[in-house]
Amino acid sequence: MLEHAYRRRFRQGLSVRSFMLARLQRLYPLYALAFILSLPFLLGQLAAGAPDRAQTILGLLCSALMLPTPDPAHLDADLYPFNFAAWSLFFEVAANLLFAALGKRLDTKSVICLVGGFALALVVCATMGWLGFGIEADKRGVLGGGPTWETFGAGVIRVGFSFFAGVLVYRFYETARLPAARPGFAISAFALVTAILALDFPSSLDLALSLFSVIVVFPLAITICARFDPPRGAFANMMQTLGLLSYGIYVLQVVTFHAVEACARHLEVQSALVGLVAIPVVAAVAYAATVFVDVPVRLTMKQALKGLA
């Protein structure tokens, strides 16, 4: 997406500052909304006597600024203790900064070198258990890592590979001029990715198959699906809506799930269905937040920050 939107603008002289301000306008409004919605839970922790009040207050301040919370006493602490999902946003912003710093100098050969380097680092570090890979394998899979301080290095490699692989996929998509993908191919690619994410690989093959999926299967599947042009109508509208809501769903999922869980406890409901109920609630919250908060706030920020670009 960023490659499509900004490559030509970098060639025309777009500055790093202007690019990063644009990314701030895109990412911060819904992140800030998630933080504000989580405040009742956080203040409740303080009122109830949080075990480490100073650390909780530090977390509040850092979270408000979209920064990770330092916690040298606990290496397994989350970078974003109040919105777990925000860890990848931090790494994405870092990747965005590198992307902007390289700007028009980032030719395709350089992208291939970056993707190859990160892929090699991913294979070696995941195999050897370096930089935090494997520490959270029971919770987040053999390639999990990045949300906590002890797996920070794994996050750098994961996001570095995925970000620049996305840039490379787009450049291939743009220059190869491949024919449009048939619906059957696109559906098969989507089904394959879904199956890989849903199923557990045998433990003896888990690492190898996970690496193959991430480095080979997923980029190919994305390339195929990108070549699929859905027919106009309800299906195309649904795809557009899902794309519109994707960021809101991601950044608001944690606080919304907490709210649904709190309601379930208050109503003394104990059922696995609570999780299923939370899914449409998250989608509805993301839709309302995108339409009524994100879009107008971004327009306001664009006007307010115009002089700084």
PLM feature segments, named:
Residues 3-5, 13, 17, 21, ...:
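Membrane-interface helix-loop-helix regions
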Residues 2-10, 40-44, 101-108, 167-177, ...:
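Structural signal for the C-terminal ends of transmembrane alpha-helices
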Residues 78-103, 155, 159-164:
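Function-critical hydrophobic alpha-helical transmembrane segments in multi-pass membrane proteins
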Residues 93-130, 170-186:
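Solvent-exposed interhelical
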Residues 7-44, 54-63, 95-96, 154, ...:
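Transmembrane alpha-helical segments and their boundary/interface "anchor" motifs
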Residues 11-16, 56-57, 107-113, 178-184, ...:
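Membrane-helix interface segments
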Residues 20, 28, 90, 111-116, ...:
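Hydrophobic alpha-helical transmembrane segments
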Residues 123, 155, 163, 190-296:
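Alpha-helical transmembrane segments of multi-pass integral membrane proteins
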